[in-house]
Amino acid sequence: MMDGVMSHGLELEIVSSSFARNEHRAQTVSGNAEQTLDRTDHGDRNRISLLSPLIWEGDSAFDAWLTASSVQVAPVLLTLPSSFAQLGLASGIGLQVLYGFMGCWTCYVITALYADYRRIKESHNTSYQNHTIQWHEVLQGLLGPRWMALGLFFNTTYMICLAAIQMIASGSIAFYINDHYSKRTWTMIFGAIFLLTTLIPTAHNYRLWSFLGILMTTYTSWYLTIAAVTHGQALNVKHTGPKKLDEYFMGAANILYTFGGHGFTVEIMHAMWKPKKYKLVYVYAVLYIFSLTIPSASSMYWAFGDGLLNNFNAFSFLPKTKFRSAAAVAMLMHEFIQFSFCSLPIHLVWEKLLGLHHSRHFYIRAIARIPIVLFLWLISLMFPFFGTINSVVGSLLVSAAVYIIPCLAHMTYYWSFMTRENAIEQPILCRGSWRAMFLVDAFVVLWVTILGVGLGGWASMKNLIQQAHKFGLFSTCFNCPKKP
């Protein structure tokens, strides 16, 4: 598939050259406009510009790969071993591969729609100075206000839950470094720290953070793999595999959640000089993620088997060592980065709602973002069910926001012969067959609707309700071991 896409991109290079040049100019203007906190502060601009090319400006394909790879997994590394215990090894690996490449497909679909949206807007001389394009705006420009409302609701709700999960995960991870404080206390502490994320303007400004993020997840993944292998199999370990339907589909929903990180595809593409490359960038990101998730989850399942069903945090099964503490610290650093990126689309929507998005003074926008972080803080304290809530978000929100809606939008928009003829991204399957493209769209929609929303939603909500009854909302220490 990748070879086909690359050859097809070369064929379209001449056709889309004007689009690329305009895009380059628009991105340059937009990027420069949002790199400083105050455009009127000329005294600081020179000092900032010395460092910005190295740590601040992230507009290349490699920067996009860093970001896509960095934000794709995060705390899921710690919950995937439990998903393998729910699914069994074969289903766990098989569903990862399936959902990974389904994610690549929907990312390609979003890329195609974004390219046509930019071409249409630029033909009307639309300026993107101090403006970041988002997914719901693409839907509105191509399909109208109803599609915009649908995309805005599901994508924003998904991002709210995803950002809250990062706070919940931070409290859970910090507990395994210092258990003198409860998970709720740690969540409150990190909620205050996460207020600093309001100071990052756009997806254009994540080069250093994305680089650090991928280092953190890589270290944690290989720590889990090596620690599990050196620990060896637990006494009387069993690998029963799926026992109950609700456990099986809950595990499948968590894997669906794992590969739902392309919910902010448009924001990343808008930060790139050549966004049409992102469809390949994301494929490479998914392949790298496979190298992190499959070895770590498989080795943990081999070592601890069915015992992983008792706790969704993989750290709880490994002895407390300096390496585990280092992995926990690495994950905490990554949670900060992940929270920042997950909350960014929410901040942008909020700024546009308040009419502040085009403000030349970034400090005004940063202050306006604070209520969003406080709201996310409240949600994370109310629903501290680490692991359980991941599956709920995966089945009900990831399914709709990043799989079903993009594929339906792709079929609807390109159903017209005229739009197909004028499409920048022509079909990549079966020698340019639109019918084959629509068949893949339909398969993704049906699969995710039935197994994700239907069965996965049922299993995840059942488990969430059980956890809420058992521990209650605003639980002090969810799934904490009893102290002797």
Regions found by a protein language model. Give the residues of each.
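Intrinsically disordered, low-complexity terminal tails enriched in acidic/polar residues
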Residues: 1-56, 62-63, 67, 117, ...
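Membrane-interfacial loop- and helix-cap regions that link adjacent transmembrane helices
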Residues: 56-58, 112-155, 159, 164-186, ...
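The first (N-terminal) embedded transmembrane alpha-helix
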Residues: 59-78, 191, 254-261, 450-452
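Central hydrophobic cores of alpha-helical transmembrane segments in multi-pass inner-membrane proteins
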Residues: 75, 100-112, 191-199
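Hydrophobic, membrane-inserted alpha-helices
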Residues: 76, 190-195, 372-379
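Extracellular loop-to-transmembrane helix junctions
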Residues: 81-125, 129
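Hydrophobic alpha-helical transmembrane segments
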Residues: 83, 196-201, 378-384
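Membrane-interface helix caps and helix-loop-helix hairpins in membrane proteins
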Residues: 201-208, 385-389
